[in-house]
Amino acid sequence: MPRLRSADPQNDAAAIAAIYGEFVRDTVITFESDPPSPGEFAARVGRTQHTHPWLVAENEEGRVVGFAYGCPHRERVAYRWAADVSIYLEPASHRRGIGKALYGTLFDCLRAQGLLIACAGITLPNEASVALHRSFGFVPVGVYQNIGYKSGAWRDVGWYQLELAPRPDGDPPPPRKP
């Protein structure tokens, strides 16, 4: 089983950049066109960890093989109980239970903070990602059609939503910091 922990912005940035860079270069899963540098990832992790969890999975040798994180769904205050979530694993780590462990821990962290909704945008088609999200209870809520252009074609993005906790009656308490 993988070891899961909070990402260290400085020490994990190179591994995170290497994993993500393959998806940027070789797939349409992410709409970024240039792989971010380790320095850019260190900054992203550092900015996000003040409000949302950013986790990594290590294999038996202690090498980072995947990451998952939450970030604000939108900037406006009314959305503060919702988080966008993402997960990336190196290809050799797919279908080994690492993604489920990583995402499950991320959702537990979000619940502990008092967040109520997790949202995921998935470039379509992507049967593996859709299946992973559905296995956690995500439901489809819509599709942005032909929203992004990458690798010579227009791409759809499916939006999926998971209720992390029931919405309280009355004013909900503000989410807590990680």
Which stretches of residues belong to each language-model region?
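Acidic/histidine-enriched, glycine/proline-rich intrinsically disordered or flexible terminal extensions
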Residues: 166-178
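Helix-loop element at the rim of GNAT/NAT acetyltransferase active sites that forms part
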Residues: 18-35
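A short beta-loop-alpha structural element at the N-terminal edge
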Residues: 2-16
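Conserved GNAT acetyl-CoA-binding A-motif
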Residues: 110-122
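Conserved acetyl-CoA-binding loop-helix of GNAT-fold acetyltransferases
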Residues: 95-108, 131-135
